[in-house]
């Protein structure tokens, strides 16, 4: 099963993430957990989140990039849900062997993240990749949708279909 942990502070303003979720939602065995919908008060139900994670073979962290990082509720979710003794540390093997995909949207163009005056995309992903590896997850190459503020609807739809194809390809290879 694919579990999408979706964190968008302003989902009603989203164009790209909305289309990505619509495409992903057409696949079988996909569960979408919208953190800002579930936890508007930031009071995360850790047991429910850990239960959802335990059912998944592929975990997707999907969100818009905010200040070169994750939205605040996703960071809190990581702090609360990925606990010692469950996700890492002595006895913390609940996530071992599962796959993790970072699916991120950005307002800037892909060249904005080239090494130079701004951090490279590989550099920006390091904290998430380190978290994944520390929890025994298998890090997959990220899916990024760039220039989302200026993309026309056809381009957004095409990129959202690419996202769906990425998830479908994972399902076909992993029978999940």
From Swiss-Prot:
Cofactor requirements of the protein: FMN
Keywords per UniProt: Cell inner membrane, Cell membrane, Flavoprotein, FMN, Membrane, NAD, Oxidoreductase
Reaction catalysis annotation: a quinone + NADH + H(+) = a quinol + NAD(+); a quinone + NADPH + H(+) = a quinol + NADP(+)
UniProt: FMN binding residues: 8, 14-17, 65-68, 105-108
Compartments reported by the entry: Cell inner membrane
A biological process from GO: positive regulation of potassium ion transmembrane transport
Keyword flag Flavoprotein: yes
Intrachain disulfide bonds: none
GO molecular function: electron transfer activity; FMN binding; NAD(P)H dehydrogenase (quinone) activity; NADH:ubiquinone reductase (non-electrogenic) activity; NADPH dehydrogenase (quinone) activity
Membrane topology field: Peripheral membrane protein
Documented EC number(s): 1.6.5.2
Pfam families: Flavodoxin_2
PANTHER family: GLUTATHIONE-REGULATED POTASSIUM-EFFLUX SYSTEM ANCILLARY PROTEIN KEFF (PTHR47307:SF2), GLUTATHIONE-REGULATED POTASSIUM-EFFLUX SYSTEM ANCILLARY PROTEIN KEFG (PTHR47307)
Assembly notes: Homodimer. Interacts with KefC.
Similarity comment: family membership: Belongs to the NAD(P)H dehydrogenase (quinone) family. KefF subfamily.
Functional description taken from the UniProt entry: Regulatory subunit of a potassium efflux system that confers protection against electrophiles. Required for full activity of KefC. Shows redox enzymatic activity, but this enzymatic activity is not required for activation of KefC.
Protein name: Glutathione-regulated potassium-efflux system ancillary protein KefF
């Amino acid at each position: 099963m694919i579990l999408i942990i979706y964190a968008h502070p302003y989902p009603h303003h989203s164009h790209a993430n909305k289309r990505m979720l619509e495409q992903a939602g057409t696949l079988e065995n996909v569960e979408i957990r919208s953190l800002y919908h579930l936890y508007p008060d930031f009071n995360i139900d850790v047991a429910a989140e850990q239960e959802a994670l335990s059912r998944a073979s592929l975990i997707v962290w999907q969100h818009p990039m905010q200040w070169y990082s994750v939205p605040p509720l996703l960071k809190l979710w990581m702090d609360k849900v990925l606990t010692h003794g469950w996700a890492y540390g002595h006895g913390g093997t609940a996530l071992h062997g599962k796959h993790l995909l970072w699916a991120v949207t950005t307002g800037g163009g892909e060249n904005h993240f080239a090494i130079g005056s701004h951090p490279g995309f590989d550099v920006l992903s390091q904290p998430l990749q380190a978290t994944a590896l520390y929890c025994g997850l298998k890090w997959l190459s990220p899916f990024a949708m760039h220039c989302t503020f200026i993309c026309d609807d056809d381009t957004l739809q095409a990129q959202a279909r690419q996202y769906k194809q990425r998830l479908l390809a994972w399902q076909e290879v992993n029978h999940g």
